[in-house]
Amino acid sequence: MQPRVLLVAALLSLLASARASEAEDTSLLGFMQGYMQHATKTAKDALTSVQESQVAQQARGWVTDGFSSLKDYWSTVKDKLSGFWDLNPEAKPTLAEAA
């Protein structure tokens, strides 16, 4: 065989193998995209079912009630402690009075 024929045959085989590899990469990419779409849908469905479940609604109610109680407690403490300091700036001694 002539060297040109061998060179052309080698180039054609390299080109064919590159095309086959490219096709495999494309199919792998498509498979991964499909898998990720399916995983995303599954995760969204699971999150929706958890959010809609009765236990989640009850837990949200407990958290809301807890924050309300905390606000009420803080308001009570603040009211009780406000008697310990005078908010009137005129009642504070000045430096001239202290000396």
Swiss-Prot record:
One GO BP: lipoprotein metabolic process
Superkingdom of the organism of origin: Eukaryota
Keywords assigned: Chylomicron, Glycoprotein, Lipid degradation, Lipid metabolism, Lipid transport, Secreted, Sialic acid, Signal, Transport, VLDL
Glycosylation: residue positions: 94
Principal subcellular localization: secreted
Gene Ontology CC: chylomicron; intermediate-density lipoprotein particle; spherical high-density lipoprotein particle; very-low-density lipoprotein particle
Similarity annotation: Belongs to the apolipoprotein C3 family.
Protein role: Component of triglyceride-rich very low density lipoproteins (VLDL) and high density lipoproteins (HDL) in plasma. Plays a multifaceted role in triglyceride homeostasis. Intracellularly, promotes hepatic very low density lipoprotein 1 (VLDL1) assembly and secretion; extracellularly, attenuates hydrolysis and clearance of triglyceride-rich lipoproteins (TRLs). Impairs the lipolysis of TRLs by inhibiting lipoprotein lipase and the hepatic uptake of TRLs by remnant receptors.
Name listed for the protein in its UniProt record: Apolipoprotein C-III
Organism: Macaca fascicularis (Crab-eating macaque)
Native organism taxonomy: Eukaryota, Metazoa, Chordata, Craniata, Vertebrata
